[in-house]
Each structure stands twice: as structure tokens, then as C-alpha cells.
């Protein structure tokens, strides 16, 4: 989750949803009476006798109900339209906005409780993604954080024409070496989680090889029409950024699963798995880290699904690290083998201490 704008004096917070975990945080934070603004579409009839058509628009809803849409990764927010385009006469009518990963929404509430703000703050993950856009003219280096994009530097190539072949190759090698050195410095200084290198030609591949060799970081390559800082702007609009954020959650989940598997053999009182066992642990505020397979959120049994929701709510309330992964991913399938949810505990719980 990224907080794009905050004005608590006027009760206003604007948020970017980065992964499914964020949808669950919003599910717990949103409440009846909130005003939510988001881009949506609505079927309207422009004039007398005309055929209706679906038109994109930004609407403000007074929230009446919030739910997860079955079998999709969307949060459905239903309410009465309080603000929207006057020409379509939508005010006062009911509407449902579906929020998914990559969407933005603004929430307006008269007074934000400390509890709600704490939950939102826990959802802001401190991810740092290094962005590089390179071509034969220049390379731009920037870091994407929750606060936005911070530009570090732009390096010019100063390449001579290709008619000076030997000199061209030497200066090209120096250029790549200079960019790689600058990247390695930023990686060390900024505690980077992943690197995205983009550009129109083959230079991104050569640079990517250098960075992979020098660092144990996840390096992603993508194609943009230009390099330099203009290429960074183009890169931010591409799906690869969303993919990287999702992959980082998978990497974190794998770390928790490996720790869980190690502890279940060496110290089984420090883990819990399965809905009932994890629920018992979370009630005691014993859960430190928890991984949930996404399929469990769509459990057809109402009572069992409600128990899963309780686990998530109590985990967030007690400061546990919560990671939700796709059920069909490798790590998701592994978690499903343990009942769909696993937890690493803060302290030992002997099974007689809590009833399933």
C-alpha cells in the first residue's frame, strides 16, 4: 500500500492498492458512513429514447456495505452517490465500486481513530525498487518508495559516432561500467529490494548481467521507447512495476514458509497451521508472521470463511506481519498443504493452552 496524499485535518487519505493484502486492510478499515472516491464506470442513458452506455467517471459514495467479490481479487464498496458528474444525474442513486490491485481510492472520514491509522500504517510496506532507464545517450537512476519516485542521477554516455569503432566500444564499456558502479552504490545506500532496468535496445541486457553478477538482487528487464529520465516516466506506467511488487510478497512469503518448516521440526510449539490452530494462536496475540493462501479467502463454508476473516483482523490488530499469496503459486500450494494458513509464533504455545 502506498499513501499518496494525507490531510487528516480534513479527514482525507488517498491510497494506491499494491497487492491483495492491501485490499484486506481496506476491508477492515472502511466503515459505514465513510465517503469513498474512486474511478468507476456506470451505465447511463444520455437522452430521451437513446440507448444506454457505460461511461467511465469518478464518483464519491457514502459507504453502506463492503465485501469481497467471490472468486476475484476485488473489494466491492456499495453506497449512495454523493458526488459525481451533474450531467448524468447519478447523485442519490446506489452504486458499487470494485477496487483491485493497482487502483487508487480516496477516503474521507470526519475523525480518524488511532486504531484505523495504525492499521493503515502497518500496511505501508517499506519496499524500495531501483529504476534504471538506459539507452545510448543517457541513463537515469531513480528509486521508487512509498513516498514516490526519488531521482538519483542521470549519466551521459558521450559516445562518439560508430565510424570511430574502437573508441566507440571503449567508451561504451566505460559508460556501462560507470552506470553499474552508480547502481551498486545506490543499492548499498538505499537497501534496495529489487531492480528494474528498462530501455529500447540491448544495453539493458548487458547492464542487467553486470548487476546480477555483483548483487544478489532480483533484476527485472523491460522495454521502453527511450532511455534517460523520460524513460523512467514511461516505465512507471508499465505492468512490470506491479509485477515486481507482487513478486516481492512471494519472496517474503517463501522466507516465512522456510522458517515455518524449520521450526515445525526443531521447535513445533513456535508454529501453528490450519484455520483452527492459527485462530487459537492469534487470539493469544502469539502470531508474529502469517501466510495465507488466497483461495482460503473464498472458502464456501460461511462459518469457516468468517473464521478466516477473524484471523486476519486479529493478526493486523496485534501487529503480526500478514502475507496473502495466490493459492496457485508454488508457495501458495505449499501453504495449502498445511490447511491454507501457517504462522510463526512470538512465543511457544503448547496445544493444551488453546482450544481449536
Swiss-Prot record:
Name recorded for this polypeptide: Protein pelota homolog
Q: Which GO terms describe its molecular function?
A: endonuclease activity; metal ion binding
The record's domain comment reads: The N-terminal domain has the RNA-binding Sm fold. It harbors the endoribonuclease activity.
Tell me what organism the protein belongs to: Desulfurococcus amylolyticus (strain DSM 18924 / JCM 16383 / VKM B-2413 / 1221n)
Q: What subcellular locations does the record give? A: Cytoplasm
- State its Enzyme Commission number(s): 3.1.-.-
The Swiss-Prot or TrEMBL record describes its family as follows: Belongs to the eukaryotic release factor 1 family. Pelota subfamily.
Its quaternary organisation is:
Monomer.
Functional summary from the UniProt entry = May function in recognizing stalled ribosomes, interact with stem-loop structures in stalled mRNA molecules, and effect endonucleolytic cleavage of the mRNA. May play a role in the release non-functional ribosomes and degradation of damaged mRNAs. Has endoribonuclease activity.
Q: List the disulfide bonds.
A: none
Which cofactor names does the annotation list? a divalent metal cation
Please indicate which superkingdom the organism of origin belongs to. Archaea
InterPro entries membership: eFR1_2_sf, eRF1_1_Pelota, eRF1_2, eRF1_3, Pelota/DOM34_N, Pelota_arc, Ribosomal_eL30-like_sf, Transl-rel_pelota
Pfam families assigned: eRF1_1 (PF03463), eRF1_2 (PF03464), eRF1_3 (PF03465)
Keywords on record: Cytoplasm, Endonuclease, Hydrolase, Metal-binding, Nuclease
Amino acid at each position: 500500500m502506498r499513501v499518496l496524499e494525507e490531510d487528516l485535518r480534513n479527514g482525507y487519505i488517498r491510497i494506491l492498492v499494491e497487492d491483495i493484502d492491501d485490499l484486506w486492510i481496506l476491508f477492515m478499515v472502511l466503515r459505514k458512513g465513510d465517503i469513498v472516491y474512486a474511478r468507476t464506470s456506470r451505465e447511463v442513458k444520455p437522452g430521451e429514447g437513446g440507448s444506454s452506455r457505460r461511461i467511465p467517471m469518478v464518483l464519491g459514495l457514502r459507504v453502506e456495505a463492503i465485501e469481497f467479490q467471490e472468486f476475484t481479487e476485488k473489494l466491492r464498496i456499495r453506497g449512495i452517490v454523493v458526488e459525481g458528474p451533474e450531467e448524468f444525474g447519478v447523485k442519490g442513486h446506489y452504486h458499487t465500486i470494485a477496487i483491485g490491485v493497482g487502483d487508487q481510492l480516496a477516503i474521507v472520514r470526519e475523525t480518524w481513530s488511532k486504531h484505523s491509522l495504525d492499521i493503515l500504517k502497518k500496511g505501508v510496506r517499506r519496499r524500495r525498487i531501483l529504476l534504471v532507464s538506459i539507452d545510448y545517450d543517457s541513463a537515469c537512476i531513480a528509486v521508487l518508495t512509498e513516498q514516490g519516485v526519488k531521482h538519483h542521477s542521470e549519466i551521459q554516455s558521450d559516445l562518439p559516432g560508430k565510424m570511430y569503432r574502437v573508441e566507440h566500444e571503449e567508451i561504451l564499456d566505460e559508460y556501462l561500467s560507470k552506470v553499474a558502479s552508480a547502481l551498486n552504490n545506490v543499492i548499498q545506500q538505499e537497501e534496495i529490494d529489487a531492480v528494474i532496468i528498462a530501455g529500447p535496445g540491448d544495453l539493458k541486457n548487458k547492464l542487467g548481467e553486470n548487476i546480477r553478477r555483483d548483487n544478489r538482487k532480483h533484476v527485472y528487464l523491460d522495454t521502453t521507447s527511450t532511455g534517460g529520465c523520460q524513460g523512467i516516466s514511461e516505465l512507471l506506467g508499465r505492468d512490470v512495476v506491479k509485477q515486481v511488487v507482487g513478486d516481492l510478497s512471494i519472496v517474503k512469503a517463501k522466507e516465512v514458509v522456510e522458517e515455518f518448516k524449520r521450526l515445525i521440526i526443531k521447535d513445533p510449539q513456535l508454529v501453528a497451521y490450519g484455520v483452527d490452530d492459527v485462530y487459537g494462536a492469534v487470539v493469544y496475540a502469539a502470531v508474529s508472521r502469517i501466510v495465507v493462501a488466497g483461495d482460503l479467502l473464498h472458502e464456501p463454508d460461511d462459518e469457516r470463511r468468517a473464521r478466516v476473516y477473524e484471523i486476519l483482523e486479529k493478526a493486523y490488530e496485534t501487529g503480526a506481519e500478514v502475507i496473502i499469496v495466490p493459492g496457485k503459486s508454488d508457495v501458495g500450494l505449499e501453504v495449502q498443504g498445511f490447511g491454507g494458513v501457517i504462522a510463526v509464533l512470538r512465543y511457544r504455545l503448547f496445544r493444551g493452552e488453546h482450544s481449536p
